Amino acid sequence: MLLPVVARAAVPAIESAIAATPGLVSRIAAAIGSKVSPSAILAAVKSNPVVAGLTLAQIGSTGYDAYQQLLENHPEVAEMLKDLSFKADEIQPDFIGNLGQYREELELVEDAARFVGGMSNLIRLRQALELDIKYYGLKMQLNDMGYRS
């Protein structure tokens, strides 16, 4: 079955989000009914794709939030990126159906992040957007299998 493999593949994204976001461990633990411990959360994620989906749901908005913050803080970037199809809309699960388009847009977002914030801002934004890809990709697979996360 593919789903447990996908759940295990989500572990690196979850680990990096936990390391980068204070308070995320307790929020995830409350959402999945786990002990407030990174190792307990990761064990639950590896064993259950639904738990993986719920866990990723707790971090899934980070890329969009970082993107919106970038636009709000830097109007010149909003102008640079005015042709991006997702500039005013939340990233939807069906958007991931065309990863090629997403990759092109992600490159433009990276250019903008580099323009306004240097490498650290670029890395943070790219990681956040990559987490969104993993979250929505897993959510679509869970939905296809009859789960609703």
UniProtKB/Swiss-Prot annotation:
Assigned keywords, A-Z: Capsid protein, Outer capsid protein, T=13 icosahedral capsid protein, Virion
GO cellular component terms listed in the entry, alphabetical order: T=13 icosahedral viral capsid; viral outer capsid
Keyword Transmembrane helix: no
Superkingdom classification of source: Viruses
Compartments in which it is found: Virion
Cited function: Assembles to form an icosahedral capsid with a T=13 symmetry. Drives the penetration of the inner capsid (core) into the cytoplasm.
Subunit note: Homotrimer.
Record protein name field: Major outer capsid protein
Native species: Pseudomonas phage phi6 (Bacteriophage phi-6)
Gene for this chain: P8
